[in-house]
């Protein structure tokens, strides 16, 4: 009984900061976009609008729950829960510091890839169960987009695995103590980041929820409390993807110079280093949203299959070839 309570406490210790970071990610996005568009942004609720996400959450919770009469009600309610659960499960293998991971098992990378692939089911259920043309078309777009860019995403991760020789996320971080992988793998980092934008349905790849075409895409018929689940899942995926990018290419919780990290320090500076890197990647997500226009859907698919995929395959062949040629393979 004590072990179960201890495990639940561990999960809460990880889950609460994640949900808070998701809440404040919305404030960061609105303030940054406001600055880029020469306007103030939210500035009423709390100091520097820090209480704005809680006001938005309260507004959504007290709204009326409207259910379409022709909807498949079981899947209609299940879809946002599935999407949020798979978004949060990805944090189970993320090391937030040395020894600070819920589960540090040897196949953590494969676990993360599997969850990112399964997460599309919630979106597909949402579009189909709502019995709406807008929602259904949005879910089909999302499914096709995520399956397509999953290939690029997986190829980029596989290149990192070939370089470090392990599937364990902690070992990948520890292998970057001297050199972060963004330096030797810069083209692969660019491919990974572009595919991460597509995986999270962010601009310029936000076709599944294009407001001017599909109202709100697969979320069109969802409102009130169940819409909050989709909202949390979307921004939770952005925070997770930013942290994962920092781990794979920016050294995770490693940071130079090492003298900053005294072993007897009261403050866990290494976790702060990971958080700073993740926030910088999140800023990049917001910057791209405020800068780039939405792509046409046929251009998006052509860009993936005829542009990015051949480059990803070529780089995936080049990385092990160079490792073998210079006799620096980790295997």
Curated annotation (Swiss-Prot):
Enzyme category, top tier: translocase
Any GO BP annotation: aerobic respiration
Gene Ontology CC terms, in alphabetical order: mitochondrial inner membrane; respiratory chain complex I
Compartments, as annotated in UniProt: Mitochondrion inner membrane
Membrane topology: Multi-pass membrane protein
Keyword ATP-binding: no
Pfam families: NADHdh (PF00146)
Catalytic activity of the protein: a ubiquinone + NADH + 5 H(+)(in) = a ubiquinol + NAD(+) + 4 H(+)(out)
Keyword tags: Electron transport, Membrane, Mitochondrion, Mitochondrion inner membrane, NAD, Respiratory chain, Translocase, Transmembrane, Transmembrane helix, Transport, Ubiquinone
Enzyme Commission number(s): 7.1.1.2
Residues passing through the membrane, by range: 8-28, 75-95, 107-127, 147-167, 178-198, 224-244, 266-286, 308-328
GO MF term set: NADH dehydrogenase (ubiquinone) activity
UniProt record similarity statement: Belongs to the complex I subunit 1 family.
Function, in words: Core subunit of the mitochondrial membrane respiratory chain NADH dehydrogenase (Complex I) that is believed to belong to the minimal assembly required for catalysis. Complex I functions in the transfer of electrons from NADH to the respiratory chain. The immediate electron acceptor for the enzyme is believed to be ubiquinone.
Protein name (Swiss-Prot/TrEMBL): NADH-ubiquinone oxidoreductase chain 1
Organism expressing this protein natively: Mycosarcoma maydis
Gene symbol of the encoding locus: ND1
């Amino acid at each position: 009984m004590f072990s179960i309570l201890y495990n639940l406490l561990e999960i809460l210790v990880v889950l609460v900061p994640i949900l808070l970071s998701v809440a404040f990610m919305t404030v960061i996005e609105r303030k940054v976009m406001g600055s880029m568009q020469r306007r103030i942004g939210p500035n009423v609720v709390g100091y520097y609008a820090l209480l704005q996400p809680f006001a938005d959450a309260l507004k959504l919770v007290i709204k009326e729950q409207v259910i379409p009469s022709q909807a498949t009600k079981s899947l209609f309610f299940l879809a946002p829960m599935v999407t949020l659960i798979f978004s949060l499960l990805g944090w189970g293998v993320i090391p937030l510091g040395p020894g600070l991971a819920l589960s540090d098992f040897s196949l953590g990378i494969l676990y993360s890839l599997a969850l990112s692939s399964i997460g599309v089911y919630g979106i597909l259920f949402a579009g189909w169960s709502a019995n709406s043309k807008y929602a259904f078309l949005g879910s089909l777009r999302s499914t096709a987009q995520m399956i397509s860019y999953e290939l690029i995403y997986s190829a980029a991760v596989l290149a990192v695995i070939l370089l470090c020789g392990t599937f364990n996320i902690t070992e990948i971080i520890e292998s970057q103590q001297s050199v972060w992988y963004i330096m030797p793998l810069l083209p692969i980092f660019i491919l990974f980041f572009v595919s991460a934008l597509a995986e999270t349905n962010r601009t310029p790849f936000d076709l599944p929820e294009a407001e001017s075409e599909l109202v709100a895409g697969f979320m069109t018929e969802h409102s009130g409390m169940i819409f909050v689940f989709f909202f949390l899942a979307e921004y939770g995926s952005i925070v997770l993807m930013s942290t994962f990018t920092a781990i794979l290419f920016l050294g995770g919780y490693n940071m130079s110079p090492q003298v900053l990290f005294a072993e007897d320090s009261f403050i866990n500076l290494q976790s702060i280093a990971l958080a700073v890197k993740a926030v910088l990647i999140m800023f990049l997500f917001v910057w791209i949203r405020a800068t780039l226009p939405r792509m046409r859907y046929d251009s998006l698919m052509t860009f993936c299959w005829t542009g990015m995929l051949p480059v990803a395959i070529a780089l995936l062949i080049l990385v092990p070839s160079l490792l073998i040629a210079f006799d620096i393979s980790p295997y």
